[in-house]
Amino acid sequence: MNITNIKKEIISFMNKMNYEVIDISYVPGIVQTCVDEFTGDEYEELTDDTMNVKLTKDLVLDDFQEQRLNEFEAYIYFSYHNIVINYTT
């Protein structure tokens, strides 16, 4: 899925929750392949200065973290897609 389609999907998702999207930004990172020391399974890990997120196939759009900036504004970080959404409530 490309970024444009992901953005459309996220805007639709946010609109259903009655939020107005201010901005959607893609957060670049470095993807590296790692091996789980217990199972031996390979997985991709996305790293940069601020994030260390395991990317797995079973994460979906509702796997997100929300952070309030103030009374009216917040952002959501969708870990699987590595996208940050700034929005008003």
Question: PLM features: what roles do these ranges have?
Answer:
Residues 5-23:
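Short, non-transmembrane alpha-helical segments in secretory-pathway proteins
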Residues 3-6, 76:
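Generic ordered-secondary-structure signal
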Residues 1-4, 88-89:
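Short intrinsically disordered terminal tails
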